[in-house]
Amino acid sequence: MNSTDFIVIRNDLQQCKVIETQLPDATALPADALLVKVTRFAFTANNITYAVIGEQLKYWHLFPAPDGYGIIPVWGFGEVLASKHPAVAAGETLFGYFPMATHLVIEAADVSKRGLRDGAAHRQEVSPVYNAYARVSGDPTYAGQQGDFRALLLPLFMLSFLVDDFLAENAFYGARRVILSSASSKTAFGLAHLLHKRGIRVIGLTSKGNVDFVTSLGCYDEVVTYDQVAAIPAAEPTAYVDMAGNSALRETLHRHFGAQMVYSGRVGLTHRASEPDEPTLPGAKPVWFFAPDQIRKRAKEWGPGGIDQRFGAAWTELVPHLPNWLDVVERRGPAAVREAYLDTLQGRVPPDQGLILSLAE
């Protein structure tokens, strides 16, 4: 049988196309393998980040593509069409990291009641979280709109949760306020929601076109457009969480706040405008926030299940807000996926939209 795959040129993300890839049919699957139909997946600016840093973080290794091309990984759902693993049945629903494709063959390993892992050799260079699949058949929190929100936000909100935890653990480095760039992005407003609950002042930076949306979220104490950052009073200690990855903006903020910039953390690349050779800046040295480090630290300190318990509570508290913040927009078929991809790449998707896609017509 064939899988329809959406591929991009790794060093020119504007160039994309759909190809057909031959997969083994149900009878020809190797031992313990699963043939999975990718039913739907979320697509956000975060997936563009996966593509931008695909070489460095080995994301391109997850789903092989023709030379020079890559398949962008996405969070979504799959249905097991056929199984050669004795503990996994056809018809099961899986949630995890899938290719932008209609089908995937998984080499099922470490199968438990709650999940399984893809043991394919080419997938083992990335963090284990990217090879894990949750078995979610019959779980209402993974169905319908709840499932869409999980695909759109759960991985991003985990990053929000970890940054919030890191900043609070370090007493915000003495800052009295936290500034977030790309304030309309899902990771940013998830973090703003958590910070706001802690009572620290949160300032969101955004473009003029997104001011109304960011203000409507209710989790930013102040919303400032990028051309007005110099008007922010510079006299008190400030922490900056950079979701945009924009070198010019980062330099402007550091020079404006000077020694009062007590923390400068780089998290995202929504603007994709970073320069490799950046000047030494006043204030705290910009550092990348590396989520796995915080996960390892807290797993050791909090013990088994400690992270899941705390994150689960934060997610449960967030979910009631999401229908007011996001409209889920479903698009199906190769042409619709291509349009959604290019719109996201060019920043044309309204911030209040969450795209749920399928390559199947």
Task: State where each predicted segment sits.
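A short N-terminal beta-strand-loop micro-motif at the entrance of redox/enzyme domains
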Residues: 12-40, 45
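Glycine-rich beta-strand-centered segment in the early N-terminal region that forms part
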Residues: 29-41, 55-105, 110
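Glycine-rich phosphate-binding loop and adjacent beta-alpha segment
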Residues: 252-317
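N-terminal Rossmann-fold NAD(P) dinucleotide-binding loop
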Residues: 188-189
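NAD(P)H dinucleotide-binding glycine-rich loop of Rossmann-like/cofactor-binding domains
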Residues: 97-176
